């Protein structure tokens, strides 16, 4: 099998509007399409960074909570590359987004920081 790339990551939101605001206003993604799926009582938004499809947000009635601490099995976190980590962290601070201290990757020497989306999904910003 030859894979080309990761197409997108799907995120189920406990509060669709709050998550949509976070992924657009905090992370700067743009919604290029949004649909209500009546049979599933579910909203779906396709979120892009530039022209690249990255995150698919879903709403479902009463989704069960999923553990998101780093040691849980399954998806650990989402990572986004940034040109200037200090500037990105300043933006998080200006929007009152709590984050961990900036750390340095011992293998690459690059800096990174973790914070969470509204449902506690860990998000990492990693410097280019």
Features from the language model and the residues they span:
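Mid-chain, well-packed structural core segment of small domains
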Residues: 71, 78-81, 85-86
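Vicinal oxygen chelate
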Residues: 1-2, 35, 46, 89-128
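N-terminal beta-strand motif that seeds the catalytic metal site of vicinal oxygen chelate
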Residues: 1-17, 75-78
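A short, acidic/glycine-rich surface segment
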Residues: 32-34, 40-43, 62-68, 101
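Short amphipathic alpha-helices within nucleic acid-binding modules
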Residues: 22, 86-91
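Core segments of cupin and vicinal oxygen chelate
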Residues: 11-54
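Exposed loop/turn and edge beta-strand positions of beta-sandwich/beta-sheet ligand-binding modules
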Residues: 5, 41-43, 74, 109
């Amino acid at each position: 099998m030859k894979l080309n790339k990761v197409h997108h990551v799907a995120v189920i939101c406990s509060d669709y509007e709050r998550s949509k605001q976070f992924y657009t206003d905090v992370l700067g993604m743009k919604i290029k399409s949004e649909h209500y799926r009546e049979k599933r009582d579910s909203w779906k938004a396709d979120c892009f960074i530039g022209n690249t499809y990255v995150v698919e947000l879903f709403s479902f009635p009463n989704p069960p909570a999923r553990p998101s601490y780093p040691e849980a099995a399954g998806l650990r976190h989402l990572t986004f590359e940034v040109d200037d980590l200090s500037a990105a962290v300043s933006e998080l601070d200006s929007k009152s987004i709590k984050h961990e201290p900036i750390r340095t990757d011992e293998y690459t020497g690059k800096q990174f920081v973790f914070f969470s989306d509204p449902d506690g999904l860990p998000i990492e910003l990693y410097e280019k």
